[in-house]
Amino acid sequence: MKGDRLVIRELNKNLGLLLVTINQYFLHARILKNWGFEELGEHFFKQSIVEMKAADDLIERILFLEGLPNLQELGKLLIGESTEEIIACDLTKEQEKHEALLAAIATAEAQQDYVSRDLLEKQKDTNEKHIDWLETQQELIGKIGLPNYLQTAAQED
C-alpha cells in the first residue's frame, strides 16, 4: 500500500530517535551495572528492549507503506557521567521523542492514516510513562538525597 510521504517522513524521524535511545539506554544500562547499580541498570536495559520493539514496529509500518526505513540518519547520544546525569540525559531524549511523536500523530491524523496514528499514540503512551518514571527518579534524588537514592539503587532483591 502506497503511503503518504509526509507520514513516512514523520515515521522515519521517530525511528531515528528510537535508534538513538536504544543505544543510549543500552550504554547507560551497562555503565550503571559496572558501577554496581544492578537494579537500576536492569531497568535501563529493559527500556532499551522496549525502544527496540517500538523501532521494529515503525520499520514494519514504513515498509508496509512502501517507504524506505532510514537507519542512517542517527542523532547524537546524550551520555551521562553520573547517575543524575544519566537520568537527566534520558529525560531530555524522552522529551525530544515526545515532541516528535506529537508532530507525527498530527501529521498522520491530517493525512487520514489512522493506523499509523494509532501506532504512534501507543508509542506516545509508553513514552509518557517513561518520562514520568524518570521525573520520579529526579524527585526521589531531590527528596532523599543522592547518597540514599544510590544506596537503594545498589541493593539487590
Swiss-Prot record:
Q: Which InterPro entries match?
A: Bacterioferritin, Ferritin-like, Ferritin-like_diiron, Ferritin-like_SF, Ferritin_DPS_dom
* Source organism: Neisseria gonorrhoeae
Question: What is annotated about its quaternary structure and interactions?
Answer: Forms a bacterioferritin (BFR) complex with BfrA. Heterooligomer of 24 subunits, arranged as 12 dimers, that are packed together to form an approximately spherical molecule with a central cavity, in which large amounts of iron can be deposited.
Functional description taken from the UniProt entry: Iron-storage protein. Plays a role in protection against iron-mediated oxidative stress.
What lineage is on file?
Answer: Bacteria, Pseudomonadati, Pseudomonadota, Betaproteobacteria, Neisseriales
Query: What does gene deletion cause?
Result: Grows less well under iron-limiting conditions, increased sensitivity to H(2)O(2) and paraquat.
Q: Where in the cell is it found?
A: Cytoplasm
**Which family is it part of?**
Belongs to the bacterioferritin family.
- What cofactor does this protein call for? heme b
Say where the protein is mainly found. cytoplasm
Q: What GO cellular component entries does it have?
A: cytosol
The protein depicted here goes by the name Bacterioferritin BfrB
- The UniProt annotation places Fe cation binding at 51, 94, 130
Q: Which UniProt keywords apply?
A: Cytoplasm, Heme, Iron, Iron storage, Metal-binding
